[in-house]
């Protein structure tokens, strides 16, 4: 049996909070024990059951065994390493390529410090973070597509 606290709408404190858009956590069903003991385990076990069921019903194929005597002409990494592979392929100096790869997470770590004074969560009111995200996404897609192309057109994607 759940214990719920019904809202007292004649309470002036609650009415003031509701007028400001607050107060939704002031009343309602408590998280303990209802959510934590009953709902969360059902969701967790249901997720595990779905994942295990899908892995049993449709296992992923591993593919052909590798032949060390028949190497392909161009060896490409997995798709999620394409932007990093393209950076290493395009930059003439390998040390500079490694430094550029290290600059990506270092630049992402500086974004919260740049916008530390900004209290908004809306992306349109956080111009620095939104700009860094958009430029980074476009650059990663550009480098990822270029890594799958031949080296002579990989930087321009054959467009220019």
Curated annotation (Swiss-Prot):
One of its GO terms (molecular function) is ubiquinol-cytochrome-c reductase activity. One of its GO terms (cellular component) is mitochondrion. CDD domains: cytochrome_b_C. Keywords: Chloroplast, Electron transport, Membrane, Photosynthesis, Plastid, Thylakoid, Transmembrane, Transmembrane helix, Transport. It is found in: Plastid, Chloroplast thylakoid membrane. The keyword Chloroplast applies. InterPro entries: Cyt_b/b6_C, Cyt_b/b6_C_sf, Cyt_b6/f_cplx_suIV, Cytochrome_b_C_euk/bac. It holds the Pfam family Cytochrom_B_C. Its main location: plastid. The keyword Thylakoid applies. The chain crosses the membrane at residues 36-56, 95-115, 131-151. Gene3D superfamilies: plastocyanin oxidoreductase, Single helix bin. It comes from the Eukaryota. Component of the cytochrome b6-f complex, which mediates electron transfer between photosystem II (PSII) and photosystem I (PSI), cyclic electron flow around PSI, and state transitions. The 4 large subunits of the cytochrome b6-f complex are cytochrome b6, subunit IV (17 kDa polypeptide, petD), cytochrome f and the Rieske protein, while the 4 small subunits are petG, petL, petM and petN. The complex functions as a dimer. This is Cytochrome b6-f complex subunit 4. It comes from Chlorella vulgaris.
């Amino acid at each position: 049996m759940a214990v719920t606290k019904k809202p007292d709408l004649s309470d002036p404190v609650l009415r003031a909070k509701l007028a400001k858009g607050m107060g939704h956590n002031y009343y309602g069903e408590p998280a303990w024990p209802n959510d934590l003991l009953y709902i969360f385990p059902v969701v967790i076990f249901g997720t595990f059951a779905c994942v295990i069921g899908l892995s049993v019903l449709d296992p992923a194929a591993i593919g052909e065994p590798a032949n060390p005597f028949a190497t392909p002409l161009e060896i490409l990494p997995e798709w999620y390493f394409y932007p990093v592979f393209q950076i290493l392929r395009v930059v003439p100096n390998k040390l500079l390529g490694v430094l550029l790869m290290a600059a990506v997470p270092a630049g992402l770590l500086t974004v919260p410090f740049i916008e530390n004074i900004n209290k908004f969560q809306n992306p349109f009111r956080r111009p620095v973070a939104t700009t860094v995200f958009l430029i980074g996404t476009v650059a990663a897609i550009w480098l990822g597509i270029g890594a799958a192309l031949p080296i002579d057109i990989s930087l321009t994607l054959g467009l220019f």
